[in-house]
Amino acid sequence: MPEYVNWLRHASPYINAHRDCTFVVMLPGDGVAHPNFGNIVHDLVLLHSLGVRLVLVHGSRPQIESRLAQRGITPRYHRDLRITDTETLECVIDAVGQLRISIEARLSMDMAASPMQGSRLRVTSGNVVTARPIGVLEGVDYQHTGEVRRVDRKGINRLLDERHIVLLSPLGYSPTGEIFNLACEDVATRAAIDLAADKLLLFGAETGLLDEQGRLVRELRPQQVPAHLQRLGANYQAELLDAAAEACRGGVARSHIVSYAENGALLTELFTRDGGGTLVAQEQFELVREAAIEDVGGLMDLITPLEEQGILVRRSREVLEREITQFSVVEREGLIIACAALYPIADSESGELACLAVNPEYRHGGRGDELLERIENRARALGIKTLFVLTTRTAHWFRERGFEPSSVDRLPSARASLYNYQRNSKIFEKAI
């Protein structure tokens, strides 16, 4: 079977979920200048064709720098914000205007044999961003550099309702007719908040947020962001992360940071369970909870391969349905990726930890430890003093977590009478 068939099947829930949602996408000037820009445009057109309401915000910093260099003007910054004098503003207007026209032209392409054939998009931009001057900070006059005051929510939504892609540039206008140079991150964040967007998607050079070892941080809560900002210091990755967290605090459900250099990064982030960048979200992307009857199918998908390998004791659907209240599960984007069960043992202060299983693709994220802690807490709440576990393959894992070797003789009689000598499981116990 072709690989794309499986991909479409796995992507179909996301295709349905994203339809009629509002996404604000921020692409910095470096991303527009990158060779992968054409692929990003194709991916945006695909999102539009799938019913996503798109607002695209572009940056222009390198393009402005180029104009300044041509005129022999030295750029000035304070706190990584450009100081925009009159000469610089002329360069900003020139660069932004030309870049906006270039993006509109790319989105308007209708080339035979291209991903955009027949798309016939309508791209609209205008004076929908009202701005005000930053003014003087720490004795520095930012002059024509401004900040977003508001966006025209009704006007933009009307365009989105009519199936336009709305293109926002990093320029804002005051009621008195002044023009202000804006940070595209500020425009995108405020647009996402004011439009009550479902997602804010921020493009950067990196795959997403990387930790101290260079590993991708896949998910964060807004309250976890300040610690990472302190570690990152003053760099563009920190700006993106700060914008993502601000949007979430402002009511945007999810913010994503993806790479403009990686072909297909946007689609991977939106249409696969684990994505390819960093997600900042108020709600939990992955949830540890008590199992419900609706989870039986997902539990069977998880444990059946392990039963076939002899790692777990076989359980029929009927048994799972009857014992579902004993289970705790880890759910990730609707998929049950881990489980464990607690069985109190009659006429004793003991319980059995059973059916601890983690999807092979997620075995290095501490989910087993998380479930073990949850089971131990449940056991304590039930007055259980000793926790038993029977295993054939994972003895060392339990030993490393405080379980001691035990025997059938140590099992309460109600459980000892059910011991399967043919399976010959090793027995461990832990005082809790």
Swiss-Prot record:
This is Amino-acid acetyltransferase. Pfam families: AA_kinase, Acetyltransf_7. It catalyses: L-glutamate + acetyl-CoA = N-acetyl-L-glutamate + CoA + H(+). InterPro entries: AceGlu_kinase-like_sf, Acyl_CoA_acyltransferase, Asp/Glu/Uridylate_kinase, GNAT_dom, NAGS_kin, NH2A_AcTrfase. It comes from the Bacteria. The lineage of its organism: Bacteria, Pseudomonadati, Pseudomonadota, Gammaproteobacteria, Pseudomonadales. It comes from Pseudomonas syringae pv. syringae. A functional ArgA is critical for the production of the phytotoxin syringomycin and, therefore, for pathogenicity in plants. Its EC number is 2.3.1.1. One of its GO terms (molecular function) is L-glutamate N-acetyltransferase activity.
